[in-house]
């Protein structure tokens, strides 16, 4: 027997994602890459660290954006500074340790500005820090990365925590 009645479905409503939502989307989408790259043998650890640092930046900015820090996260001294973003998130009551863990500090050292003399972004570019005119010293990042598997686990936990926090 066939029912020929018409069903009335509610209208589908979609909203434009906010910038904060965008940060969360990127963090979530980078996470599988971090997890896979952290366990593959014979792969340079820089690949996992670079993507992990970007995922960490995005998840912290998602939390801060949703907590009204839209302008603060763009300040030059904070923008790519994972330690500063971590501390801001702690100050906004994200349930994380007050002091960033070593893996965060190490990621921060390769991810953003590490010198008053310029933007270094060591994970992205293998360039040295050029000191002020007349000083020919060139400092190159040593390539340190965190222990990858524990880092990936902690980033997953943080993403899950922030997802719950921004839904409140």
Which role does the model predict for each range below?
Residues 35, 45-67:
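Short, hydrophobic, well-ordered secondary-structure elements
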Residues 23-26, 51-52:
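Amphipathic alpha-helix face/heptad-repeat signature
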Residues 27-46:
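A long, hydrophobic alpha-helical segment
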Residues 13, 17, 41-50:
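Short, charged/polar micro-motifs that form catalytic or ligand-binding hotspots
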Residues 1, 39, 60, 128:
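Residue-level marker of positions within ordered structural domains that often coincide
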